[in-house]
Amino acid sequence: MPTPGTGSVPELQLVPFQLGHFPILQRWFATEKELVQWAGPALRHPLSLEQMHEDLAESRRRPPLRLLWSACRDDQVIGHCQLLFDRRNGVVRLARIVLAPSARGQGLGLPMLEALLAEAFADADIERVELNVYDWNAAARHLYRRAGFREEGLRRSATRVGRERWNVVLMGLLRQEWAAGGAGND
């Protein structure tokens, strides 16, 4: 089981998500498209704490089904990310990864992702980490490839946002690839 708060890199530390972080997170999504890009189609704009109750409940189970993290720099919340556990199969899904608009473009995406991967693989039973990303999100796909993820498949027309249909790319990283420093597959 990952130890909360151990995933840190220079200038950035992951800390367990607290209810006091929610108002900060909520401000980062001005439109439905921004919210769906982050959370998938399950949540509705505007984001409300009530919508996150299921995530929070899953984080309180023993063992937790989900861990919610805030990324902090200089005691300021500048990001959010989650781990979803499929312990039976030794798989973790990275989910709901976002940096504050003011923190983007500063090279913080990879350190946050590396800290999150360290948390995921701290559990010796985890063999695989995977994620979904929309195919049009070239910056995120590039970041994930830099961290060692490989594109493994495409779910066409998987998400509806208004009148648009978005394709979803499945990406995965195995423990041995991560341990070997799988970064640089871009």
From Swiss-Prot:
CoA binds at residues 37, 97-99, 105, 137, 142-144. SUPFAM superfamilies: Acyl-CoA N-acyltransferases (Nat). Pfam families: Acetyltransf_1. Its EC number is 2.3.1.-. It is an enzyme of class 2 (transferase). Catalyzes the transfer of an acetyl group from acetyl coenzyme A (AcCoA) to an acceptor substrate and releases both CoA and the acetylated product. It prefers the antibiotic chloramphenicol. Homodimer. This is Acetyltransferase PA2578. It comes from Pseudomonas aeruginosa (strain ATCC 15692 / DSM 22644 / CIP 104116 / JCM 14847 / LMG 12228 / 1C / PRS 101 / PAO1).
